[in-house]
Design a protein with these regions (language model features):
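Short, positively charged and aromatic/hydrophobic N-terminal segments
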Residues: 2-6, 12-18
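Charged, low-complexity intrinsically disordered segments
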Residues: 16-202
Length: 202
């Protein structure tokens, strides 16, 4: 699969491996033209499920496969499948069928269909329900980190190398980098940035 990134100026890679990575998170909703104008020297990389190149694998919806389900003796094909599958609603418990969904579509379990969300179950057969922020820390963060470390090291290395030589703009539909902010969905692009910079949240 061809990697397609956007840059106005190619430039030469610097040899100083100690240069601090330059990674910026921007909204996928912005036009490519406006982003190029704002960051004329940057490499712009789409890391959403709508990316048209290999960087789509960074999407939590992508079926990277073999992902251990936290507190459960099972594996899943995507991070989002785990996140949605372990949700517990007023009218529905966990749904392990989401662990095997590969098409990156219809992965959301909504309150409109199932009633208020009560939390995330701590394991498929667990009795404890986790709050939103706690679930982020115990389910989402370790699952996404596992994917970065076990499935995407070549792409992570590519982002790291490029970002030491020119700014890299990662496009995501969500831009919230604060794990402890319950008001906005967490940006997975911010987790890529944090991982590359060596400060992945725990």
């Amino acid at each position: 699969m061809k990697i397609n990134v956007y840059s106005e100026k190619s430039g030469n890679f610097a040899s100083d491996s100690k240069m601090k990575p330059m990674i910026i998170i921007e909204s996928k909703k912005k036009t490519l033209e406006s982003l190029k104008a704002q960051y004329p020297d940057a490499m712009i990389i789409d890391v959403t499920s709508h990316a048209q190149d290999e960087f789509v694998k960074f999407s939590p919806f992508y079926p990277n496969c073999g992902i251990p389900v936290p507190f459960t003796d099972d594996i899943a094909v995507s991070v989002e499948g785990i996140w949605q599958g372990l949700k517990v609603f007023e009218d529905a418990d966990v749904d392990t069928s989401y662990f095997s969904k590969r098409d990156m579509k219809n992965l959301k379990r909504t309150v409109r269909k199932y009633g208020p969300c009560l939390g995330h179950r701590k394991g498929v057969h667990g009795e404890e329900l986790l709050g939103y922020i706690e679930a982020r820390k115990l389910i989402y963060l370790p699952c996404y980190k596992w994917v970065l470390e076990n499935k995407l090291q070549k792409l992570v290395a590519a982002v790291r190398i490029i970002s030491k030589n020119k700014p890299v703009v990662l496009l995501d539909y969500n831009t919230n980098p604060d794990v402890n902010n319950p008001k906005k969905p967490l940006s997975h692009a911010s987790l890529i940035k944090a991982y590359v910079e060596g400060n992945y949240p725990e």
